Amino acid sequence: MEIRVYDKNLIFLGVVEDFKSLIWTRKYYEPGNFELHAAGTDKNIQLLQAGNIITKRGAKEAGIIGAYTDQEGSNTNQIVRKGNFLGSYMSRRILHYTHNFSGTYEDGMRYLQQNVEAIPLLELGEKCGDTTQVCFQTTWKNCGTMLTKLAKSSGLG
């Protein structure tokens, strides 16, 4: 398995060398998370900085490096990086003011994403065609929390 690293502008930085384990946790209704244990080489330390993005070759998901620790000792020279999948960017956005919506769940989710501070390079995929209707009002809420609530109540992942 190849772990590729990009900066926040999606410029390819390199490939992680000699990693011990990768826990890649997918979640259906909300962004997943990961934990990477790798050799503490100079190259890995340089690549695996907070804010950089990792992905498995061929995977649809990618994660943002958040917390990390370096473990050095006579028996170990290992780095640990943890983070959340890119969907977690929505949890960094607040829905300012009052928003009223009536339509399909899918259109409601898209509406919320379009009414927060723009996320550079964000592109929404094709519509899935869900026709289930919803009405909601939100004021000063976390966008990620609202998207998770809509996903759970509609069954859309």
Model-identified regions with their sequence ranges:
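Short coil-to-beta transition motif at edge beta-strands of beta-rich domains
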Residues: 44-56
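Residues that flank catalytic or metal-binding motifs in active/ligand-binding sites
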Residues: 32, 79, 154
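Short beta-strand and beta-hairpin "edge-sheet" elements
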Residues: 54-84
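Short beta-turn/strand-loop junction motif enriched in small, turn-promoting residues
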Residues: 41, 69-70, 155-156
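Short active-site-adjacent helix-start/loop capping segments
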Residues: 44-46, 63-64, 73-75, 89-92
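Catalytic micro-motifs at enzyme active sites that drive phosphoryl/nucleotidyl and oxygen chemistry
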Residues: 23-24, 67-72, 136
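Charged- and aromatic-enriched interaction segments used to assemble
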Residues: 84-157
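Juxtamembrane "anchor/assembly" segments of surface/extracellular structural proteins
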Residues: 1-47, 82-88
